[in-house]
Amino acid sequence: PIPSRGLGDVYKRQTNYFAKRFAAKEAFLKAIGTGLSKGFKFNDITIINNSKGQPFIELEKKIQLFIKKKFKIKKYQIHLSISDEKKYSIAYVILNESLK
């Protein structure tokens, strides 16, 4: 038998997890000014956490090249913040040229 105790918490955590990642991907696409156009898909963007739990964005090569061409930069940084409160998730992305 599957224990029913705690399954609601597991579902809630999974829902929050995916909602925050969706918000982060949407915020990123807005930061580069495309939305889901230019042939980009949500699967082209991956949200991961580093060893300290800080979220960051990994991009497929085609999006990396698009950013460099559109903004006429060679290197860039993506800053990501994700948060949630009860039934709401929010994310914001700052994209800036890297001087390093």
Residue ranges of predicted features:
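A short glycine/serine-rich beta->alpha loop
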Residues: 12-16, 79
